[in-house]
């Protein structure tokens, strides 16, 4: 969904302070994809169905729906971006059966090579978004695997495309999403981690408050890709950066109401409660996480236990007995 220091060694919220900056810097590039003048994007319903299965955490179903896309006339870039998102969900689910790093890199570079020789100012709005998305995902994989310097190089490739999106924020819903993520996380990174000031010296200016407001607007849109990713990042912003735990819980509950079987959302609700010091509620959410994990369709034993095990370690670290 979407966004310097410990990126989730999984998708956890457990970070190591030295690497925390990487997570903030990365977050504004992690998204799947206003007002009356804003052009609303409309992905084909078959693409939406793939994402819907991912959000429901039914990854085998998403895989079947993705494979069916190749026999349609749908734009190949849309198919490839859906493919990359699905590979990412498999990776963070804890699955070890495929080389997701290599698979994602191959697909992303294939998309980039289709577009990279066209001058940025001659691209369609969707092609600009596609290039931002692809370079961002390359960075996402690099940081996840702790290849930080390679990740920074990929981030730099986004700047020409990013500037177009920022200058046209209100023209296109995906640009509004990009602008919200960039403005918030770039400003937050510089404020919390001054070591990154040189990186942003040549980057567009950022406004933390503007970013938050744009993400809030995006969270109210009808496009489920923009709505869900905005809700997800507002949840993470509120508990990881703003320490506004009640607001974070509100967004977590919205996501869980929409997708009650999504283990990622349940895990983050657990982390919010832990970080807020609400240990009895965190323990109850841990139990709920185990229940949902047990019932989730099509997962192997490693995937079923992946987030539960991380949550269990967090409980033990907080001196809470998971068996109680």
Language-model segments: which ranges?
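Short coil turns that delineate tetratricopeptide repeat
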Residues: 74, 122-123, 169-171, 223, ...
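Short coil/linker segments at helix-helix boundaries
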Residues: 43-45, 60-63, 83-125, 129-171, ...
């Amino acid at each position: 969904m979407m966004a310097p220091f410990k990126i989730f060694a999984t998708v956890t919220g457990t970070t190591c302070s030295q690497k925390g900056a990487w997570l903030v810097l990365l977050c504004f590039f992690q998204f799947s994809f206003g007002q009356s003048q804003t052009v609303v994007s409309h992905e084909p319903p078959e693409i939406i169905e793939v994402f819907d299965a991912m959000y429901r955490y039914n990854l085998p179903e998403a895989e079947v729906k993705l494979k069916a896309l190749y026999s349609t006339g749908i734009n190949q870039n849309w198919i490839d971006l859906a493919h990359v998102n699905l590979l990412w969900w498999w990776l963070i689910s804890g699955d070890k059966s495929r080389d997701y790093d290599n698979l994602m890199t191959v697909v992303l570079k294939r998309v980039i090579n289709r577009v990279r020789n066209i001058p940025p100012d001659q691209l369609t709005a969707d092609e600009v978004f596609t290039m931002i998305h692809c370079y961002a995902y390359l960075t996402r994989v690099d940081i996840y695997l702790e290849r930080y310097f390679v990740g920074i190089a990929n981030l730099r490739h986004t700047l020409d495309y990013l500037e177009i999106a920022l200058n046209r924020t209100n023209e296109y819903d995906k640009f509004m999403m990009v602008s919200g993520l960039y403005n918030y996380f770039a400003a937050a990174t510089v404020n919390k981690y001054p070591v990154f000031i040189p990186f942003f010296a040549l980057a567009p200016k950022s406004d933390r408050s503007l970013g938050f407001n744009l993400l809030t607007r995006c969270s109210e849109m009808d496009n489920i890709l923009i709505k869900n990713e905005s809700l997800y990042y507002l949840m993470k912003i509120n508990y990881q950066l703003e320490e506004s735990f009640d607001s974070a819980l509100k967004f977590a509950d919205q996501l869980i109401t929409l997708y009650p079987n999504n283990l990622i959302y349940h895990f983050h609700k657990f982390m919010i409660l832990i970080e807020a010091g609400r240990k009895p509620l965190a323990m109850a959410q841990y139990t709920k996480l185990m229940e949902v994990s047990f019932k989730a369709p099509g997962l192997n034993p490693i995937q079923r236990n992946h987030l539960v095990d991380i949550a269990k370690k967090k409980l033990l670290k907080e001196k809470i007995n998971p068996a109680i």
